[in-house]
């Protein structure tokens, strides 16, 4: 799913979209796979629409019973606290939906961004679960 999505973004938007996943995605539990796909999709959409990113990278690793995912872009960046406040006021829930999806799976979600420095999202999710 992620590889096809990356190819689609490269073709449609001319962005360099790098995906590094150490094993076949279809071996992951369906709930985990689906939620991670939606989070990556939202992050990529935000990077293109708001950040004017030219490069997006998604790196996934497994170890110690958990999956770690890092999504980075070279876009314009933003003040995270300010955007979260404005998003709540405008009832725009992209960032909060990403975070909720990860917390639903007992994971952790962090976002780091500053104007002029791109955006980095880090996710950790336990690997247990039903497929």
Residue ranges and their predicted role:
Residues 1-131:
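Coiled-coil dimerization/phosphotransfer module
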């Amino acid at each position: 799913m992620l590889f096809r999505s990356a190819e689609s973004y490269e073709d449609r938007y001319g962005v360099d979209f790098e995906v590094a996943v150490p094993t076949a995605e279809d071996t992951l539990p369906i709930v985990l796979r689906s939620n991670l796909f939606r989070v990556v999709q939202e992050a990529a959409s935000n990077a293109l629409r708001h950040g004017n990113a030219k490069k997006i990278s998604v790196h996934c690793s497994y170890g110690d019973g958990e999956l770690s995912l890092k999504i980075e872009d070279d876009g314009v960046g933003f003040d995270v606290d300010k955007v979260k406040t404005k998003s709540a006021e405008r009832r725009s829930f992209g960032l909060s939906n990403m975070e909720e999806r990860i917390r639903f799976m007992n994971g952790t979600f962090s976002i780091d961004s500053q104007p002029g420095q791109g955006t980095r999202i880090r996710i950790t999710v336990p690997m247990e679960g039903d497929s």
